[in-house]
Swiss-Prot record:
It is found in: Secreted. PROSITE patterns: FN3. InterPro entries: FN3_dom, FN3_sf, Ig-like_fold, M28_fam, Peptidase_M28. It comes from Pyrenophora tritici-repentis (strain Pt-1C-BFP). Zn(2+) 1 binds at residues 111, 131, 191. Belongs to the peptidase M28 family. M28B subfamily. PANTHER family: METALLOPEPTIDASE M28 FAMILY MEMBER (PTHR12147), PEPTIDASE M28 DOMAIN-CONTAINING PROTEIN (PTHR12147:SF26). Zn(2+) 2 binds at residues 131, 164. Residues 340-433 form the Fibronectin type-III domain. Glycans are attached at residues 88, 179, 220, 299, 347, 353, 390, 395. This is Probable zinc metalloprotease PTRG_04772. GO terms for molecular function: metal ion binding; metalloexopeptidase activity. Binds 2 Zn(2+) ions per subunit. One of its GO terms (cellular component) is extracellular region.
């Protein structure tokens, strides 16, 4: 059951606010990256100005805990056919400082730019209602609500720019964080979370997909070889983050089930989580359960009696609100748990029926204990939990829970029962009583 603060947060998520934000973003006509940055009513500049003011309204209610900044740079033509003249790319970043572990960050957000059928048409209408005003609306609504609370770790709410031109805003922010050695523990991308209907009319209003990369994109050859040798390719940080989100956010409070997809993204598609993965961070992407491709990246037109275009009329605002509850639960649960244990290992130097684990306590929030999780290798989610207390090693002496037959994970447990994502143990060699 969510704690009292989280229950209160969930009760405040407003369908009307989410709808209002989406309609306002659509009203700018186009939010194409190359569109006007000076017109006060049309184009990406007008959208940026309005969004910045709305995030600042949230910050003004935070008693100084939240700050709003721009992460900006100039993108020049040359290596990107979708950039045909120099353009300013500005991501809006609202940072809510953690009350106890402010150096550990969790980030969520969507992209506020849009496009139509032609990726360099910066003058034609590109309403971008689902893609991705729906995700930005969630980020803004959660910033508004969370500003009144004190999560223990830092939460960042973003509106990315330049996504449709090649994930440009996310790439720059990820590199900015990497250059500053920011401890970003997870990035949660919200890209198309506003409609549950497919092109054939199929609807799935209580499910949301979560795309989770396998073997990390930046993993070195030695670690990758070890991961593959122990069958750990399905237990990357991103996939264990996905299991965490499934566990905390699939419930009656959100009225949703998180459907974890073991892929980086959909076929031939990309999202703002990828640059964070490429920078060495853990990132995942929420996407609605079904898609209608007559509504994505389409000119607003009618052909053979059928309406095309990413219009507000296709939105299911109740679904969008439930998606916001999933994200709120995810961010609150991550930010109030201790960090995951580090240097998690399992002794494989001897052929025996015992499983000997060791790990290091994480920095930041105090840990009240640890749990060893396990599941059959064919199971998608954790099925069993062993509470091992507040120790940094454990000998599992059960011959029926054999390390050759299951996948293990170790997670931290903190105050209030908040738990970290699990970590896959890698093989190590040590003395019997290490």
């Amino acid at each position: 059951m969510p704690d009292e603060d989280l229950q209160d947060i969930l009760s405040q998520i407003s369908r009307d606010n989410i709808e209002s934000t989406i309609r306002k973003l659509v009203s700018f006509g186009t939010r194409h990256t190359l569109s006007s940055q000076t017109d006060p009513v049309r184009g990406v500049g007008a959208a940026r100005t309005w969004l910045t003011a709305k995030f600042q309204e949230a910050a003004d209610e935070s008693e100084g805990k939240m700050t709003v900044d721009w992460n900006s740079f100039i993108k020049y033509p040359g290596d990107n056919e979708r950039i045909i003249f120099p353009v300013n790319i500005t991501t809006i970043v609202a940072t809510l400082k953690g009350s106890e572990d402010p150096d550990r960050y969790y980030l969520t957000g969507g992209h506020y730019d849009s496009r139509n059928s032609n990726p360099i048409d910066y003058q034609g209408d590109a309403p971008g209602a689902v893609d991705d005003a729906s995700g930005v609306a969630v980020s803004l609504e959660l910033a508004r609500i969370f500003a009144h609370y004190k999560p223990k770790s830092t939460i960042v709410f973003t509106a990315f720019a330049g996504e449709e031109q090649g994930l440009l805003g996310a790439q720059n922010l990820a590199q900015t964080y990497k250059n500053a050695s920011v401890n970003l523990a997870a990035m949660i991308n919200l890209d198309m979370v506003g409609n549950s209907k497919a092109e054939d009319g199929t609807t799935d209003p209580h499910n949301i997909r979560l795309f989770c990369q396998g073997t990390p994109l930046t993993e070195n050859a030695t670690t990758m070889t070890s991961r593959l040798s122990i069958g750990g390719d399905n237990d990357s940080p991103a996939r264990n983050l996905g299991r965490f989100i499934y566990e905390v956010a699939s419930n009656v409070w959100t009225e949703m089930t998180v459907r974890v997809i073991y892929r980086l993204d959909r076929y031939s598609r990309g999202g703002d989580h990828r640059p964070f993965l490429e920078a060495g961070y853990t990132g995942v992407r929420f996407v609605q359960p079904n898609e209608d491709y007559t509504q994505q990246h389409q000119n607003v037109t009618v052909r053979n009696g059928k309406q095309y275009g990413d219009l507000t009329q296709w939105l299911d605002f109740e679904y969008n609100t439930r998606a916001a509850k999933v994200v709120a639960t995810t961010m609150w649960s991550l930010a109030n748990a201790p960090a995951s244990p580090t240097n998690v290992g399992i002794n494989t130097t001897m052929s025996d029926n015992f499983s000997q684990f060791k790990w290091d306590a994480p920095k930041g929030l105090p840990v009240e204990g640890y749990e060893i999780l396990y599941r059959e290798t064919i199971e998608p989610h954790w099925t069993n939990v062993i509470d091992v207390g507040n120790v940094t090693w454990y000998n599992l002496t059960s011959a029926t829970i054999h390390k050759d037959n299951v996948i293990f994970g170790v997670r931290s447990v903190g105050k209030g029962g908040y738990k970290s994502p699990a970590v896959l143990p890698f093989p190590f060699g040590c003395a019997r009583n290490c």
